[in-house]
């Protein structure tokens, strides 16, 4: 199975798990509790702008849960807001107040519902370290996954604001 965590876009061959029941959602659940899936049941897992919504104290166990359901050799495609890029945008003295406000919302979440808050500020160092601790190998940063049309490719103000990584079980 190919599992899209937090997704909404239907795509042939992929199943969607989302925290809310919506059209195209196959499973309702939380990224931090994937116990409804068997060990080694997924060949690929995709999570775009979901992991930052996990409280800091649950990040490692969440990544271990993702690792558990991936088949050996399986790929985890993960995208999060890149705090290094967002900080650069935010402190830019040439940025107007609207740019700064939009950037701040990308840092902390839009906060339009109880699930739209960011608990963790990711960068390449943190991502590589947590993936390694969870048992992943070969964490490689990529510009784009080319799988779904989503925030992983978002480039406001000409900057790609996502940290996109593919890790292997």
Regions found by a protein language model. Give the residues of each.
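S-adenosyl-L-methionine-dependent methyltransferase catalytic module, highlighting the catalytic core
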Residues: 58-65, 71, 75-168
